[in-house]
């Protein structure tokens, strides 16, 4: 895909070579955005990236390379999308400008509302991130991370409501969704496996 010249203000692209190999990272644009946030004295810098391969759960080498670059340049949190599947979530300790800090990445948050049923894409989540500012230093840091398991139910073509976004644990407590209990349990297990974490808020 080659972007027309007059589309330069409509998107911030990850790569300079969208029409070929997706290997030339658009470092200048990415780092300019990070610098702009720093210049505003942002308490937290969060990068939201549309990346990865559809229905692939594990990140590829290029995603890891981009994540490392962003973290080393001051980004605190990376939230990914595009694959339609919830991907790995992890906290890291990085050293930036000689100081250690905790950063977080969610490679893909999956779908929030969708009619897709491919793979395990109906098992999704809502991410909860908490930040705390030190009253003395003014430094802001990640203080809590969890996710709420969610399931996108397809009730069929004849249903009054075809698709529903169901917070799994509250839905499990309702008799209205008793027949979905095995599906909910499987979704919880899938999310734990896909994220490679114990960040489920129900743990």
Write out the residue ranges for each language-model feature.
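Acidic, metal/ion-coordinating pockets
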Residues: 1-203
């Amino acid at each position: 895909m080659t972007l027309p010249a007059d589309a330069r203000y409509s998107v911030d692209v990850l790569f300079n070579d969208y029409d070929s190999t997706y290997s030339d990272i658009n470092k200048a644009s990415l780092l300019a955005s990070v610098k702009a946030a720093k210049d505003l004295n942002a308490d937290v810098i969060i990068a939201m990236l549309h990346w990865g391969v559809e229905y692939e759960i594990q990140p590829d080498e290029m995603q890891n390379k981009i994540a490392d670059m962003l973290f080393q340049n001051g980004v605190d949190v990376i939230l990914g999308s595009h694959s339609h599947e919830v991907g790995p979530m992890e906290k890291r300790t990085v050293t930036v400008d000689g100081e250690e800090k905790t950063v977080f990445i969610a490679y893909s948050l999956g779908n929030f509302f969708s009619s897709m049923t491919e793979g395990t894409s109906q098992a999704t989540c809502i991410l909860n991130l908490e930040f705390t500012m030190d009253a003395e230093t003014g430094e802001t840091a990640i203080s809590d991370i969890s996710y709420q398991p969610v399931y996108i139910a397809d009730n069929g073509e004849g249903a009054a409501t075809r698709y529903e976004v169901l917070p799994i644990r509250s839905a499990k407590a309702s008799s209205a969704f008793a027949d979905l209990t095995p599906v909910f349990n499987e979704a919880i297990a899938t999310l734990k496996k896909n994220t490679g974490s114990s960040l489920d808020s129900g743990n």
